Curated annotation (Swiss-Prot):
The gene coding this protein: alaS
Single Gene Ontology BP annotation: alanyl-tRNA aminoacylation
EC number: 6.1.1.7
Protein name as it appears in the record: Alanine--tRNA ligase
Residues bound to Zn(2+): 563, 567, 672, 676
Pfam families according to UniProt: DHHA1 (PF02272), tRNA-synt_2c (PF01411), tRNA_SAD (PF07973)
Amino acid sequence: MSGVNEIRSSFIDYFVKNGHEAVASSPLVPRNDPTLMFTNAGMVQFKNVFTGVEKRPYSRAVTAQKCVRAGGKHNDLDNVGYTARHHTFFEMLGNFSFGDYFKDRAIELAWNLITKEWDLPKDRLLATVYYDDDVAYDLWKKVAGLPDSRIIRIPTSDNFWAMGDTGPCGPCSEIFFDHGDHIPGGPPGSPDEDGDRFIEIWNLVFMQYEQLPGERLNLPRPSIDTGMGLERISALLQGTHDNYETDLMRAIIAEVQELTNVPSNGPQKASHRVIADHLRSSVFLVADGVLPSNEGRGYVLRRIMRRAMRHAQLLGAREPLMHRLVPVLVREMGRAYPEIVRAEALATETLLLEETRFRRTLERGLSLLEEESAGLVSGARFPGEVAFKLYDTYGFPLDLTEDALRGRGIEVEREAFDAAMERQKAEARANWSGSGEAATDTVWFGVREREGATEFLGYDTETAEGAVRALVQEGKEVSELPAGARGFVVLNQTPFYGESGGQVGDSGLVSGEGVKACVLNTQKKLGDVFVHDVEVTEGTLKIGTPLALEVDHARRSAVRANHSATHLLHEALRRVLGDHVAQKGSLVAPDRLRFDFSHPKPLTADELAQVEDIANTYVLRNEPVETRLMAVDDAVASGARALFGEKYGDEVRVVSMGTDSGNGAPFSVELCGGTHVKRTGDIGIVTVLADSGVAAGVRRLEALTATAARRHLNAASTALQTTAGTLKVSTAEVEARVAALVEERRKLERDLAEARKKLAMGGGGESGPAVIEVNGTRYLRIAISGADPKDLKAIVDEGKTKIGSGVVAVANTAADGKGALVVGVTADLAGKFDAQKLVRIGVEVLGGKGGGGRPDMAQGGGPDGAKADAALAAIESALGA
């Protein structure tokens, strides 16, 4: 049978020929659903269609949906690599009917595909139905000709699907394939159904009810939702019982074997499979805008990456491996998912950086793991407290600890680990549960369905006329907004830009006969409904009211300059740093711009200067900024940059600016729906303020343009001139003069520290005799005041040199009355006295607690510096005890 790519295509083509719309996979980060960590099923992008709050221009659809299950309820991570069918990343093939065909056509389409198109033997197929679904039972007999013995009624929830406690629901019918009696396992519904003989290949969900509190009603327009795992059906069609034996997975595993020189069918087979699976989820998540971090989706990605990297080390990889596998994945899957082609450089850089960091973590963590587990035998339990220490101190995830111990037959004490982790787990849940795109209020679905999209005029004009189509206040439609009221207005057309793509929404004024309102902000709902946040200042705003619309021109002009500048900076960053640079977010406001991009380390001063110079070169050329509409595939194919994870329509706006000196092509070409200047010279000037880190592998550039940049530069110039006047030098000499002053200050501080040290050594400071003997041990006690805390250790070291053998204690009283204490023990007495124990005795007298350091040098402090002498005396008593 054909390869995985051909099987995917044949599924989609079959349903297209049968009247279905081919819909692209949605991103792995769900849209409009803050409760879901990752897209984990084909129906996720159609959730609002099934519930009736969203309408699509088609009633039948077919998709190949990329999915991840590695966190929360749907978590396959721990099993991946050790079974034939578990994955973190998988593709879900599905056909959908939104109130169109129902059970009879769904069963007919499914049966014809698998038996006629794919030629699966009919006598190896069986179906399950919900126990009271007589209609589906009879259809399987009629359409497929299945005998009663191969139609199984299932009474459990396995064959009844519900979206939640309320909403659409209905019975399921699953198609199973019988691999033969040479494989253990029984049919579905039997005691040994979990065996590998009977494998589910397709699930058909018949959404025919609506669950309400206390009752279940028939839906007026029943729907169909189906799901078939591409990996599972590909294995079957390619004659194997193992998903990892398909051509796609074999290609990745073969590359792992080539790079590690470890056979993929030997004792370390599981490691090859973990790496192959986790490579897919890692690259696809990065392509959809997720980067490794310590919270939310980024933390799940980091766990996936690091689990794969741990197995790379088990295969003997001495250098980072994962990034070297990206090309084979792009070669195998890039045609079906062009986003991973665009993200190849970023994914490669991210994997290399993460594996480099993790190898340092592994070295520290594995050392402790081996030390703590050295005496354990098979069947023993590894202390949960130590597992938590590995996690908390060394960044060593629990699943890696369990993975490392599994081969030796050792389990982790999960109870103790879970108790220690309770707080962190609660925080992690809070971090991601609301981290998705905010859910859209239901009211806007109704407005969108009734009024359609808002016509946006703002690319060509900042003034227009429009009519009120809807008014919304506190989540509900209203008929009017009186003077003093605040609410949302939807117009038939508008010049006001709605907040999107990082660009802030427009503000301005709307007015009509007897009515005026300030537009405070403009947003976009459902992609194309422009919503104006207004405060009525005169009269009453009503449905149908004709209005004159005027954008705040000065504010829009400043926003345009900043948005165009982000495009120039984006391309300049790529020219200076490399092709791995990709936009990760932005803020385009009237007073500033902020641009987040992928890069593993801070920019040097020279790199920042180069980026700024390149951007200003194109500003000074004052070249035209061109925009045109193109088909999205043509735009991307032409080289226009797209934002990873962004959802584009069939037609997109392409913004080009500048001319590359080398080849005459446009300097910057991006897909962008924002507003821009007419010529690059309208930006005025670009001034980069700062580069900072916002997450692992993500940097942030902040900059100003036009008037804001000029004011900033003027302020900086004024400050420089004022400083020059204070120093009595020219502005050109300020840097050298300040450097000289800083060095002079450092020298004075060093001289002062040396003077204090000599004073302390000279006569024991304020405490009288410097050295005494306590039970044969020399004890040097020094009480001083006003010393820099960082000088105390130097004084102790000097004291240890002076006495040769013994104990030195220095107590300092600061200007605020607090006390600091440092205790040192010479090397020859290391086995007799512990500086940490001695310092704790003195710190307690100062009113403090604890103290830290090493057995030969420790420090601590307390609020009562007046008791410095008493603290030194307490240490003396301890030496004599």
